[in-house]
């Protein structure tokens, strides 16, 4: 498991989740794992073509997680668009290394529920 935080939809901060960077820092440990953004991911802002659905932020992060065969779990922070988060489909996932109810942005990116209970 890799923990990070405060991405704030920043292209510069996003580079810390680039597979090349993660492999140079953690080797094979960054593959088949969970990468957790602890607050303020910055996804899903209305009328922001970079961070909304179909935007570069979600597309890039989804492709990187797919390449790493990993899942990115975002714990919402105080700078999130909760209206959009709670409009996402709710899914219950039980994987080998985590379980809980999530809001799904994509197959590789999930938001935790507020006050949710999770097993990692």
Question: Model-derived features: where do they sit?
Answer:
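Core catalytic region of metal-dependent phosphoesterases/phosphodiesterases
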Residues: 4, 10-118
């Amino acid at each position: 498991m890799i923990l990070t935080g405060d991405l704030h939809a920043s292209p510069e901060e996003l580079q810390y989740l680039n597979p090349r960077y993660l492999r140079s820092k953690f080797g094979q440990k960054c593959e088949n794992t969970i990468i957790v953004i602890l607050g303020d991911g910055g996804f899903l802002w209305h009328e922001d073509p970079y961070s909304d659905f179909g935007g570069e932020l979600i597309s890039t992060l989804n492709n990187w997680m797919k390449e790493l065969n990993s899942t990115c779990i975002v714990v919402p922070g105080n700078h999130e668009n909760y209206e959009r988060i709670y409009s996402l489909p709710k899914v219950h996932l039980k994987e080998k290394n985590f379980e809980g109810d999530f809001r799904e942005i994509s197959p590789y990116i999930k938001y935790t529920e507020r006050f949710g209970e999770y097993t990692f």
